[in-house]
């Protein structure tokens, strides 16, 4: 139904508009932004699944919820690895507690070229975290934390980044008092984040991983659980989107 190609000098979009009204479910797997595409598909009568991981784009997509409801359509936002799998892992871990109040996400690796560009951009923006009832902004690339991922990935330094997870996790579980998200990055990644990418991204990233740390109460005791998945992030995102 639709195809999109983007490079440093070329931006090409091709859409077979006649097929828009024939689609029952559309999965948006191209790079951000998705909000205008989602609007077109919803108005054409299709259910929409977005794999966007851009913070501003996902906020704009959430604003389309009322429109989707008016058209009796479903608009699923954040159906990828992060966000996406992170929410599923949070929901799974929540069943292991009597109550939860903290969730901390960390991601290593990228999927395809658009994912790599988003990783680069996320380190240049301002991270957003939920802290005791308030949204806090911190510079991306700050707040180094050594995060252990499932083997064969292992441990990587992770940093605050402008990603969509905190807003979506807070919307899904408003009882959470603290939410943060970090991505792995090298020193070069952080120092060059505000510059154009020095080299074109690979067609597909290598082995990646997603983990989430959840804290809460179990009986009268404070408890913490960590769960993660190691796999190519493109594979994770595809599985989440396909099974949504």
Task: Spell out what each predicted region is.
Residues 52-75:
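Rossmann-fold NAD(P)-binding glycine/threonine-rich loop
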Residues 50, 75-77, 105, 181:
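General beta-strand structural signal in soluble alpha/beta enzymes
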Residues 75-94, 244:
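Short alpha-helices
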Residues 85-89, 165, 236-241:
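Catalytic-loop motifs flanking and including active-site residues across diverse enzymes
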Residues 54-59, 81-85, 110-113:
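Short gly/pro/ser/thr-enriched loop/turn and capping motifs at secondary-structure boundaries
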Residues 5-60:
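NAD(P)H-binding glycine-rich loop region in Rossmannoid oxidoreductase-like domains
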């Amino acid at each position: 139904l639709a195809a999109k190609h983007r490079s440093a000098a070329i931006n090409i979009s091709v859409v077979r508009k006649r097929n828009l009204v024939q689609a029952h479910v559309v999965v948006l797997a191209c790079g951000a932004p998705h909000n205008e595409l989602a609007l077109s598909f919803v108005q054409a009568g299709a259910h929409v699944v977005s794999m966007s991981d851009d913070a501003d784009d996902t906020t704009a997509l959430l604003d389309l919820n009322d429109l989707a409801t008016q058209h009796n359509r479903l608009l699923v936002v954040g159906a990828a690895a992060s966000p996406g799998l992170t929410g599923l892992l949070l929901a799974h871990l929540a069943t292991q507690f009597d109550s939860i109040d903290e969730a901390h996400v960390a991601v290593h690796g990228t999927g395809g070229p658009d994912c790599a560009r988003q990783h680069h951009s996320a380190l240049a923006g301002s991270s957003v975290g939920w802290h005791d009832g308030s949204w806090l902004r911190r510079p991306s690339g700050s707040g180094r934390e050594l995060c252990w991922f499932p083997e064969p990935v292992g441990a990587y330094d992770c940093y605050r980044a402008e990603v969509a997870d905190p807003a979506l996790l807070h919307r899904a579980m408003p009882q959470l008092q603290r939410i943060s998200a970090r991505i792995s990055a090298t020193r070069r990644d952080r120092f060059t984040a505000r510059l154009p990418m020095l080299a074109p991204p690979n067609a597909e990233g290598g082995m990646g991983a997603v983990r989430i740390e959840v804290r809460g109460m179990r009986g009268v005791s404070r408890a913490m659980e960590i769960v993660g998945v190691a796999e190519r992030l493109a594979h994770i995102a595809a599985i989440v989107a396909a099974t949504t």
